[in-house]
Amino acid sequence: MKLSALAIAAFSTLAFGVAAEADDNFPGAPGVIALGGKCQKLVVAKFDATKGCKGELASVTLVNGTVTFIFTSDGKLLGFQGDGKGIKPASNGNARLPLSLVTTGVGNKMTGEVKVAGFCTFGNPYAGKPTAIECTAESKDSAFTGSFRTSGKAPVQKNGGK
């Protein structure tokens, strides 16, 4: 009996330790999370879409490690996408994701993509305080900017995204 209790305690500690570690490694494991807060800026080429930008940002991590931060404005989607394996530390405890694509869509479906160079800089939204997610990218023809400040509340796991 004592061995079983120890095994359960060890398993529980391991399980909770892994969950906490995943939170510390935002954007983390494959899936979709929603971050509440305020969209501070969203610009596509010369069009300023900030006024219609929603107070929710999606972070999508695919099984292959691709990470996309998706802004929504007036039913349209703008995603800043890069290889999560390329995330490096940045200043002030933030991290930096190099970008390779900007994706576009309507409703819940991404329908277009543009090759870009740029990056997203972000803090850990699980830290319990507001943090910024700021993305800038340039293609041959356009520039894209998205800036979002989280509320400080923990992100919410959504269905799908795998």
Report residues per predicted region.
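Positively charged n-region of N-terminal signal peptides that target proteins for export
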Residues: 1-5
